[in-house]
Amino acid sequence: MRIVDSARLWFAEGNSDKVYEVDLVEVATDQYVVNFRYGRRGTALRDGTKTANPVSLAKARAVFESLVQEKRAGGYRDGNATVTPTPLAGDPYRTGPVVAAVPLEVQHIVRRLNQGRRRQPTIPYDVRRAETLGHVAAEPALLELLRGCAATDTAFAAQLIPALAHCGTSRSLSNLASYVVSPQLGTLARCASMMIAQRVGGSADTYARCVAPLLAAVQPSLDDDNSTAVIAIATSVMSQALTVGLYLSGHAAARPAVIAVVRTAGPGDQHIVHVLYKLAGLQRDGEMFAICARHIDDQRSTKDNRSAQRYFRRRTVRTLRRLGNAASRDFAPMACAMLLAYRDSDAEPVRHGVFGETWPAFARYHALNYLLHDNKDDLFRGAHDTSAWHQGGQGLSRIELDDAAFPALWKQRPDLLWRLVCGGQLHAAIDFAALTLRSNTGFLASITDDELADTMTDGHRTAQKFAFEFAMQRAMSPTLARGAAASNHSPAHDWVVAWAAQHPSDVAASGTWLALLITGN
């Protein structure tokens, strides 16, 4: 059997979104048939034939062309054409081009999604990729797949709902409404609905339907902006529904309570942390994602939680890698939040294996090693399940910029690199950020003297050294002198004293300078 020719047609008008496919097939030597398939986009298509018995090529070609022309005359368009569907009067969902100006990769993904699960075995990958890219052009195909999803197929629906959270418009809200009450998918549907509503409008109605029912126990305290009371209630109840409601509410008094729940969660409350971790990953909330990931990572490993703990370690890296591969603008904020969550005190004793390998101090922190050392030649990921990293017997070389995962994406966000320098508590992470920033002279010039002084005063020792390096390149000012005098970096003290010795008249004329020299470290 050989397909000689085929046509992929589709029709979109108002709420109608249909597909019609025609194939001219050679079933034997000089014997041909014309088959067709039709149905709503994304669903299993019905099939049929226009030739009950095989015919000659000339006759089959005539039947094929006639059927294609008939469908085109009825409003069908070629499947690879750029089409602006005609909206129905008053239709709020069809307000402009659906396929126009869509990136080529998104067009390929949409085409595969439109073929449905029966004809496209890579659908789960395409759904995840659509979620990562977050383009609205994928919404119609995702909705069709969701409508055709069996009530018992919660696993596939759990992939489609996050994709709609990033690709959906107001059209998706009505389709997600039925999932809000689902025991298995309700939390995902609530989160997706809130994300869409915040993006396209209608947050008040969606909040009342999806979030408010979960907050009855703390609503008076939220109304009073009493974060202390909210924390007390949330940590005493330790309810998944309440914690999810607080997180989705976005209320200023709610977030400290959610963080407190994560930090105080015991072995019996880990399901709450796992749910928050997934919601934070869906919303690309770097801070909460990192807090939950580190909490899971820091739990004492037992036979009951070891498998889940290792799974979440791998999932953290998988989330970051997908964002990086898509060149997503969310990669750098998520990665920065993860690196800010590690400290020098997280180091563990160095271990040596029987085959000469060395497990360094931060070997078990999969996300940390992935972000800083993914492209490093002398550091390797160990077994898949444990995800620990080890090095050869030659010792670990100094960190280089190209060793990190997606260095080009880091270079696009010097503000986050500077944040990592100022707020980081891990030498390796700060060293990486400083190395990346050194070549960005334009951004470094925009850093104020106050910021440099604060970093020299309160930053990590590595950050103080980096800030002092650039402070030296500037004209001395009382602000820089204040930071250098309070720094733990000895050369900074020497710099201030040497400048004062060379400019005694300036020091004598300024009470600020005298105070700095008297009170400085």
Residue ranges and their predicted role:
Residues 203-211, 217-405, 409-419, 423-428, ...:
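Extended alpha-helical scaffold segments
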Residues 1-32:
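Short N-terminal "domain-start" leader segments
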Residues 99-113, 135-148, 169-181, 201-216, ...:
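Amphipathic alpha-helical scaffolding segments comprising HEAT/armadillo-like alpha-solenoid repeats
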